[in-house]
């Protein structure tokens, strides 16, 4: 049974691009950068992968052509598993290159989402294959909960790559991922400090006040300007905080997903915070 979209509307901008564009425009008017993501994952058919590539190319052109975005750095966020990663890495890399050629033409950045741990190495392999040709227009996501991220951070700092750092929302076994949130926060802050020291324009993707304040303090103590990195949050969460931080002079990016395949993303948001579950329950009661 397909659940009604209104349940996810707090976290997903719309089921179509046209439904999502007014959301993007409103965020931009408030001085917030946007990363637009077409929801979907794990494509196993070549024609579907090619169609996903073409959708991403259209997203680049759509965002690049929006009015009122002067001084903002809108971008798209993509999943390589939608472009054939699980079919053939070379096929996926070719699709990504075609997308990045268009992105470079429009000077628009493409963020490579990090999915489950089974795709981590493949994602980084493909990233490193294309990065030398598009150093200003592509960067990966790293998850603080994964034990391997320590060495991945070192590698990205060596390259000077823009990284989106998040805690990680996928269920992973204790053999490869930290399970204790206190430990994950400690790793997150360590990785944040290394990224701020050695990369430009990395994204500190967190809603955690302790991590936000610690990041601000570290940047101040080391004379790292607010224009040298950005905070990132998800659409529908901490909306007042997003605007307040932008007003305080910080770069604030909002990750804005859309599409009909919203249920996996919606489920991950519910697992993350009990407040999200209460929001959905209230919506059901009101409905």
Enumerate the language-model features and the residues they cover:
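Positively charged, amphipathic and often flexible ligand-engagement surfaces
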Residues: 1-287
